Amino acid sequence: MQELIACVDHLRFDLELAVEQQLGAQPLPFPGMDKSGAAVCEFFLKSACGKGGMCPFRHISGEKTVVCKHWLRGLCKKGDQCEFLHEYDMTKMPECYFYSKFGECSNKECPFLHIDPESKIKDCPWYDRGFCKHGPLCRHRHTRRVICVNYLVGFCIEGPNCKFMHPRFELPMGTAEQPPLPQQTQNQQKQNNNQVLQRSSSLIQLTSQNSPVSQQRSPQTIGVMQLQSGTQGNRGPRPLDQVTCYKCGEKGHYANRCTKGHLAFLSGQ
């Protein structure tokens, strides 16, 4: 009723013009000062601010959706050039690392966001289309919906506001590849192992056929090599007569069985 009787929308006060044009705003004494409590510069949003770093108002470029964690501690040195938000807003705080990593946070007054992991899962575009080959092993969400009968016939008057599902018939493009199924990975590993074994066996056959040294070896040399390998494999501990204790310098016992002290070698000198 007041707007009909005495409308003042067409009136402009001098104070409003002064605030919009930033009249009387003095430049900063030196650049880089903290301007977290100042208003946003209207001329900078229009790319018409000529004060630069000496402007007493904040220069915000673009939409900053996350609060600067260094600014919360008073350690951010970028000022207006920081790509994060210099404003304490609970809805734009960074995500809590402990809650996202372990599913719980012991800090009752944690200032960071606790986001439910299930809310991060995206809907599977293949399942929404009709079929997903990964089934329950798919990393995306499979949500059961009722298909709109009118949309299947050809037209639905509700459009995007319809409570039923309007399936998409085009192939989803640009989606991340799904991890392979466990059976597929096992089959691939078996195939790779078989290929490696075949290659190694073929190489052994080629070397045995082409090496002249193996053909020139006599059975006597082969027998000597077998005896040497057998003696090395069955080699037992040395006799005590050949053992020298490094503590006392005497023969006949090991150092761990020596009854003398660790300075016994000095008495021998």
UniProtKB/Swiss-Prot annotation:
Q: Which organism is it from?
A: Xenopus laevis (African clawed frog)
Q: What does the annotation say about its assembly with partners?
A: Component of the cleavage and polyadenylation specificity factor (CPSF) complex, composed of cpsf1, cpsf2, cpsf3, cpsf4 and fip1l1.
Entry GO terms, CC: mRNA cleavage and polyadenylation specificity factor complex
Homology family? Belongs to the CPSF4/YTH1 family.
Q: Which residues form the signal peptide?
A: none
> What does the UniProt keyword field contain?
Metal-binding, mRNA processing, Nucleus, Repeat, RNA-binding, Zinc, Zinc-finger
Q: What does this protein do?
A: Component of the cleavage and polyadenylation specificity factor (CPSF) complex that play a key role in pre-mRNA 3'-end formation, recognizing the AAUAAA signal sequence and interacting with poly(A) polymerase and other factors to bring about cleavage and poly(A) addition. Cpsf4 binds RNA polymers with a preference for poly(U).
Q: Where are the zinc fingers (C3H1-type)?
A: 35-61, 62-89, 90-117, 118-145, 146-169
Supply the name of the protein: Cleavage and polyadenylation specificity factor subunit 4
One annotated GO molecular function is: RNA binding
Instruction: Please state where this protein is localized.
Output: Nucleus
